[in-house]
């Protein structure tokens, strides 16, 4: 007995020492060597038993014979059935039959790989001596059996027919290849085949995204143009006196772009059934180190890093081309050369291939209720992150209301004690897991620090009053605190919290970051400079910015240190002293592009501009948006919530410069020059003003609940044909006149199954003929005028790493979508 125990203990150690791959737990129950040897006596190899009994082998069409579905051998009973890629899927049906013991282990008779249906993963039989011996035995039996040993003449005739059909199919393939060589245009518009992708180690998040990008033919077309050597681009001069545009010669694309092009070509042209995207993934890891280490990652973040990385390489190509063009001329002064290069970089009108395919534009419209002045701000996007509300959101909103009430009561008490105090009004998201006791304790500590701060200000004798960051207010008393009104614009990029889950809060002279720590905003005098940096980690807040001014003024999100200059009349001028202070160091520069406004705002700066817009039509859309069922959990409802009309009231009022100028202009102006800012009620809405050729939608299923992250598993309905017109502005740029529909066709889905800690990403991709409308829109800018039905037809496939299976459309629409890929058809 002792020997048996020691032997039983050493077996798992030996198995685990062979490889780091986990051993399948179902080998013992799913493997029956005795039954298998009996079943393999005088057996016909590579023929599905069920198809043979149904007389479907002899009636196969030429197309089905050409596909030649793989046959899987059950290691429990020796049953041979066609794989899941076939039409009948007899091997899978054999496993699904109810039995006392599972028939879960199957062996592929094509490549001799073992698959476990229960684990839904490949089993490496080198890890198990018993499984390896069985596979070797089966291979020997299959090798010893020859067609001559078959006594049935019908089988020989069947094999002869197969050989004849295969020869005919080879001749047809050669004809098709010759036709494709003669007509390269036909080859470009043909359907892209679906191939599996090798898992490099928890890289299913990467494989699922790449499967959908590989089914984007226009991306492959543009990458061919990018790779062309000697590409010359013309850039209009920034100075009107110069009439000739600058011609620049672009360098070869960057390593990430080249790896992407190589991957797409391999997916299209290789004859292998499985592609290993090792080079592309390594280039992504070089751009974003966070994806190293073979950990579970987020598919949407991977997509953003990939697109941003390729776009940055394209911008770098143009910048280097401009610099080389000036180096070849007679320019010698370095300072002048730098200034000219910067001017041309601002003027450059060469959008990258990423923006041409995935780029769209959002327009935020805000209107003052008093003067009805309309102002706009434009912001580009590569994807839209849509909020997903679940049943727990109602409970959280109730807790937020109670928390808000207690915070407002404390603020009222502090106002009675300090008449001249000003408050930092900031919309912030308080984790629901934080207790009220901790909130009150932190509040008291902040008040004590504020008292000490005011004492220091009395000693110094000079007090600075910051009113909404950019304007100066004369302090009536020496006991004034910093007043800042920070407002955040909705982040249409990745990972942000829903607007429903954010309630306005007021804090007394403190700023609270997402980790729950409070940092005081120190008073700044002419003898000291201070910078306060609030780091936002892991989660970015998507609170809506209250607009500080409707006429080309906005509170900066990036203020890197405040420098003060004392005026001649004793006032402190800070309007020209703010530089970029990064309040969100975790985000990339491309993701948030709000800077302080000066006299010469740079391109890309997010500026609210006053426009002569009719207030009656400023918030109109291309199509009626009131026909949606608000109770329905669908992608249309998520878009409706994302673009819903908001009212700025109470603490979220608009600081209107037009109303302020009207109030304090003329004889009403104060002799001392003092002017109080006028806050008014306003209306705000964000709509799509440029519909992208390829629309990418992201459902924010991963949300923060207290100090933890959770996943929302609610099913969201999404259609095959999506009309984006109810969410577009009335003057949408790339929509034909008098068109009231902006139609998109679904061609890709990324699904996340499982939980936050142990989940799996798979892809649904549709093979179809390439859309001529989409190619003309991206390549030539031609707006589609009519509906193209052919682009909506195709075959859906479900891809889980290396395994590809044809599925019906109903299964795609019932999946738990995380990313949706739509292409423009009208």
Curated annotation (Swiss-Prot):
Location relative to the cell: Nucleus
First and last residues of each zinc finger (UBP-type): 22-142
Cross-link (Glycyl lysine isopeptide (Lys-Gly) (interchain with G-Cter in SUMO2)): 140
Region (Disordered): 144-189, 393-458
Functional summary from the UniProt entry: Specifically deubiquitinates 'Lys-120' of histone H2A (H2AK119Ub), a specific tag for epigenetic transcriptional repression, thereby acting as a coactivator. Deubiquitination of histone H2A is a prerequisite for subsequent phosphorylation at 'Ser-11' of histone H3 (H3S10ph), and is required for chromosome segregation when cells enter into mitosis. In resting B- and T-lymphocytes, phosphorylation by AURKB leads to enhance its activity, thereby maintaining transcription in resting lymphocytes. Regulates Hox gene expression via histone H2A deubiquitination. Prefers nucleosomal substrates.
Active site positions, chain numbering: 204 (nucleophile), 760 (proton acceptor)
Post-translational modification: Phosphorylated at the onset of mitosis and dephosphorylated during the metaphase/anaphase transition. Phosphorylation by AURKB enhances the deubiquitinase activity.
Keywords: Activator, Cell cycle, Cell division, Chromatin regulator, Hydrolase, Isopeptide bond, Metal-binding, Mitosis, Nucleus, Phosphoprotein, Protease, Thiol protease, Transcription, Transcription regulation, Ubl conjugation, Ubl conjugation pathway, Zinc, Zinc-finger
Annotated domain remarks: The UBP-type zinc finger binds 3 zinc ions that form a pair of cross-braced ring fingers encapsulated within a third zinc finger in the primary structure. It recognizes the C-terminal tail of free ubiquitin.
Subunit architecture: Homotetramer. Associates with late pre-40S ribosomes. Interacts with CEP78; promoting deubiquitination of tektins.
Lineage: Eukaryota, Metazoa, Chordata, Craniata, Vertebrata
Bias-annotated ranges (Basic and acidic residues): 158-180, 393-407, 420-429
Catalytic activity: Thiol-dependent hydrolysis of ester, thioester, amide, peptide and isopeptide bonds formed by the C-terminal Gly of ubiquitin (a 76-residue protein attached to proteins as an intracellular targeting signal)
Cross-referenced HAMAP family: UBP16
E.C. number(s) listed in UniProt: 3.4.19.12
Modified residues (Phosphoserine): 188, 414, 530, 551
A molecular function GO annotation: zinc ion binding
Pfam families: UCH, zf-UBP
GO cellular component: cytoplasm; nucleus
The name this protein goes by in its record: Ubiquitin carboxyl-terminal hydrolase 16
Residue positions binding Zn(2+) 1: 24, 26, 116, 119
Binding-site positions, Zn(2+) 2: 48, 51, 82, 90
Binding-site residues for Zn(2+) 3, renumbered to this chain: 74, 77, 94, 103
Extent of Acidic residues compositional bias: 408-419
Similarity section: Belongs to the peptidase C19 family. USP16 subfamily.
Source species: Bos taurus
Predominant location category: nucleus
GO-annotated biological processes: cell division; mitotic nuclear division; monoubiquitinated protein deubiquitination; positive regulation of DNA-templated transcription; positive regulation of ribosome biogenesis; positive regulation of transcription by RNA polymerase II; protein homotetramerization; proteolysis
């Amino acid at each position: 007995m002792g020997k048996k125990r020691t032997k039983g203990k050493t077996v798992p150690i030996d198995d685990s020492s062979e490889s780091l791959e986990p051993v399948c737990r179902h080998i013992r129950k799913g493997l029956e060597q005795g039954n298998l040897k009996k079943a393999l006596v005088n057996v016909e190899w590579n023929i599905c038993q069920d198809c043979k009994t149904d007389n479907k082998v002899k009636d196969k069409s030429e197309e089905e014979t050409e596909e030649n579905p793989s046959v899987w051998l059950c290691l429990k009973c020796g049953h041979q059935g066609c794989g899941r890629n076939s039409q009948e899927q007899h091997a899978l049906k054999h496993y699904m039959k109810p039995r006392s013991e599972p028939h879960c282990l199957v062996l592929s008779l094509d490549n001799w790989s073992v698959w476990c249906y229960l684990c839904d993963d490949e089993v490496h039989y080198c890890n198990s001596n018993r499984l390896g011996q069985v596979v070797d035995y089966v291979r020997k039996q299959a090798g010893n059996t020859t067609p001559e040993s078959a006594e049935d003449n019908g089988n020989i005739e069947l094999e002869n027919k197969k050989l004849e059909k295969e020869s005919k199919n080879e001749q047809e393939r050669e004809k098709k290849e010759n036709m494709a060589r003669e007509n390269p245009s036909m080859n470009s518009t043909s359907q892209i085949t679906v191939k599996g992708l090798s898992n490099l180690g928890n890289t299913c998040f990467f494989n699922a995204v790449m499967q959908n990008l590989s089914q984007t033919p226009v991306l492959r077309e543009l990458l061919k143009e990018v790779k062309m050597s000697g590409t010359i681009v013309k850039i209009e001069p920034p100075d009107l006196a110069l009439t000739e545009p600058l011609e620049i010669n672009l360098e070869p694309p960057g390593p990430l772009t080249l790896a992407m092009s190589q991957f797409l070509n391999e997916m299209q042209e290789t004859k292998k059934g499985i592609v290993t995207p090792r080079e592309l993934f390594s280039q992504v890891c070089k751009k974003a180190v966070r994806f190293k280490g073979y950990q579970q990652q987020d598919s949407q973040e991977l997509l953003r890093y990939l697109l941003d990385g390729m776009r940055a390489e394209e911008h770098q190509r143009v910048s280097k081309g401009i610099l080389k063009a000036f180096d070849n001329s007679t320019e010698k002064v370095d300072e002048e050369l730098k200034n000219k290069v910067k001017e041309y970089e601002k003027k450059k009108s060469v959008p990258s291939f990423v923006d041409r395919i995935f780029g769209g534009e959002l327009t935020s419209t805000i209107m003052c209720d008093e003067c009805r002045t309309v102002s706009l701000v434009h912001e580009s996007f590569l994807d839209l992150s849509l909020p997903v509300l679940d049943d727990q959101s109602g409970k959280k909103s109730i807790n937020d209301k109670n928390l808000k009430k207690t915070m407002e009561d404390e603020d009222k008490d502090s106002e009675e004690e300090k008449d001249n105090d000003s408050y930092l009004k900031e919309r912030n998201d308080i984790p629901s897991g934080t207790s009220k006791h901790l909130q009150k304790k932190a509040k008291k500590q902040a008040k004590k620090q504020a008292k000490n701060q005011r004492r220091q200000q009395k000693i110094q004798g000079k007090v600075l009053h910051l009113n909404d960051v950019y304007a100066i207010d004369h302090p009536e008393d020496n006991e004034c605190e910093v007043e800042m009104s920070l407002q955040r614009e909705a982040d249409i990029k990745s990972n942000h919290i829903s607007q429903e889950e954010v309630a306005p809060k007021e804090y007394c002279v403190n700023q609270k970051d997402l980790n729950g720590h409070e940092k005081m905003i120190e008073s700044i005098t002419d003898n000291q400079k201070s910078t306060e940096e609030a780091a936002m980690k892991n989660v970015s807040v998507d609170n809506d910015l209250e607009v500080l001014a409707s006429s080309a003024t906005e509170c900066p999100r990036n203020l890197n240190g405040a420098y003060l200059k004392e005026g001649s009349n004793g006032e402190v001028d800070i309007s020209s002293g703010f530089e970029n202070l990064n309040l969100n160091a975790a985000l990339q520069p491309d993701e948030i592009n709000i800077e302080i406004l000066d006299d010469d705002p740079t391109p890309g700066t997010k500026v609210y501009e006053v426009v002569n817009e009719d207030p009656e039509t400023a918030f109109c859309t291309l199509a009626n948006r009131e026909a949606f069922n608000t109770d329905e959990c669908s992608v249309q409802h998520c878009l409706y919530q994302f673009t819903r009309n908001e009212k700025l009231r109470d603490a979220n009022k608009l600081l209107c410069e037009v109303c302020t100028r009207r109030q304090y202009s003329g004889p009403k102006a104060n002799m001392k020059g003092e002017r109080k800012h006028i806050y008014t009620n306003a209306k705000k809405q964000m709509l799509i003003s440029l519909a992208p050729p390829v629309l990418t939608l992201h459902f924010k299923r991963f949300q923060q609940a207290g100090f933890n992250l959770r996943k929302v598993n609610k099913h969201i309905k999404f259609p095959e044909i999506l009309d984006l017109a109810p969410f577009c502005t009335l003057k949408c740029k790339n929509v034909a006149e008098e068109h009231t529909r902006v139609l998109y066709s679904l061609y890709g889905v990324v699904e996340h199954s499982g939980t936050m800690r142990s989940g799996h990403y798979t892809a649904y991709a549709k093979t179809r003929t390439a859309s001529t409308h989409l190619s003309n829109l991206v390549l030539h800018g031609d707006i589609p005028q009519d509906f193209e039905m052919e682009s909506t037809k195709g075959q859906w496939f479900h891809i889980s790493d290396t395994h590809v299976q044809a599925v019906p459309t109903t299964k795609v629409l019932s999946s738990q979508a995380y990313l949706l890929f739509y292409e423009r058809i009208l």
